[in-house]
A protein has these predicted regions:
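Core segments of transmembrane alpha-helices
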Residues: 107-111, 192, 217-228
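Short, membrane-interfacial amphipathic segments enriched in basic
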Residues: 176-196
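Transmembrane helix-loop-helix hairpins in multi-pass inner-membrane proteins
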Residues: 1-13, 64-177
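Short helix-coil transition sites and intra-membrane helix breaks within transmembrane domains
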Residues: 32-39, 44-46, 68-79
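A short amphipathic helical element positioned immediately N-terminal to and/or at the very start
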Residues: 9-17, 85, 192-204
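Alpha-helical transmembrane segments of multi-pass integral membrane proteins
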Residues: 26-33, 64-71, 106, 216-220
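Membrane-interface helix starts
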Residues: 17-26, 201-216
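Membrane-embedded helical hairpins/re-entrant loop segments and their flanking transmembrane helices
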Residues: 38-62
Length: 229
């Protein structure tokens, strides 16, 4: 996907034109970015009683970025991470909470950085982005909206039950699911939400780890900005 439609000679010429130290630094920062997410997953998973070690959690991060890169709209990353975490003996509910908190931290950092630039460097942004400044505001708004929705799902797991029941009724009407299995499916959702809520409460008892996850996410996000420099 990276090299589709590109000429290998031009790519190689661009790579050779780079300074060795700059190229090595960019590669190191790229690896740091991915490994940092694995570290954050380990910190949160440990608080939720997960079994996976640091290297295994880093492998979840690499797996997530890989499948995000090859699936439409980057939708395949977290499902594959959840699958691997479950296969390694971690509970689905705890793993789901960990991945959602990781996503919230990532989005929240983007919102904070975007809002900071808008407040203190708004004129520079307008001059630099020109006609694309509206897209910047749209992106900031969408990231904020997603952050609020996911945070709501973490704090108010009842939303999951309401949403799952709504989708269940919709799929039954579309004849994608059998109506006879609705009771069983709803019971599974309720059991999942109970475990999910216990994992959320457990994380709330470890505010230090949540703060560490946010700070590490801030460092991780800014390391990506340094790569382009």
């Amino acid at each position: 996907f990276c090299f589709s439609g590109q000429k290998p000679q031009e790519i190689w010429a661009a790579v050779k034109s780079m300074r060795g130290m700059s190229l090595a630094g960019a590669v190191a920062l790229g690896l740091f970015f991915v490994c940092m997410e694995g570290t954050i997953i380990r910190i949160l998973l440990g608080a939720a009683g997960g079994k996976s070690g640091l290297l295994t959690c880093i492998s979840y991060s690499f797996l997530g970025f890989f499948y995000s890169g090859i699936t439409p709209s980057a939708t395949g990353g977290q499902p594959m991470q959840l699958y691997e975490m479950k296969r390694d003996g971690n509970s689905v509910s705890s793993s789901t909470v960990v991945l959602m908190v990781t996503a919230v931290c990532y989005k929240l950092v983007l919102v904070c950085i975007g809002a900071f630039l808008l407040i203190f460097q708004g004129e520079m942004l307008r001059q630099y982005l020109g006609g694309y400044f509206g897209l910047y505001l749209l992106g900031l708004f969408l990231n904020l909206a997603i952050t609020l929705v996911v945070t709501g799902m973490i704090v108010l797991p009842q939303w999951i039950i309401v949403g799952a029941n709504a989708f269940d009724r919709l799929f039954v009407k579309l004849h994608l699911w059998k109506a006879s299995g609705s009771v069983g499916r709803q019971e599974k959702v309720r059991c999942f939400v109970q475990e999910y809520h216990r994992a959320v409460l457990f994380l709330k008892e470890h505010p230090g780890r949540l703060a560490a996850a946010f700070l590490l996410t801030f460092v991780q996000r800014n390391s990506a900005f340094v790569i382009t420099w």
